[in-house]
Amino acid sequence: MSVTNVSNETNATKAVFDPPMGITAPPIDELLDKVTSKYALVIFAAKRARQINSYYQQADEGVFEFIGPLVTPQPGEKPLSIALREINVGLLDHEEG
């Protein structure tokens, strides 16, 4: 009878994650300097994200009613992240009302 040495050791691999995007990049504190309140930021970013999303949908149809992203989008970046970056860079002006 032969016994084979079997090692129960496992090689733990280190998880690799992409850096977080969205509300963590750009930082929320920088974004809040651009608007009057966190609620205004939510509404402002959501409206712009809807415009960007509509632009992408209409681009497939050849209709350009909305303005596309004002910053260069990263591959796979969501419209809300694009909108937050536009706000942070100062490409959009927020008006209460």
UniProtKB/Swiss-Prot annotation:
Its EC number is 2.7.7.6. One of its GO terms (biological process) is DNA-templated transcription. Pfam families: RNA_pol_Rpb6 (PF01192). It is an enzyme of class 2 (transferase). GO terms for cellular component: DNA-directed RNA polymerase complex. Keywords: DNA-directed RNA polymerase, Nucleotidyltransferase, Transcription, Transferase. PANTHER family: DNA-DIRECTED RNA POLYMERASE SUBUNIT OMEGA. This is DNA-directed RNA polymerase subunit omega. It comes from Corynebacterium efficiens (strain DSM 44549 / YS-314 / AJ 12310 / JCM 11189 / NBRC 100395).
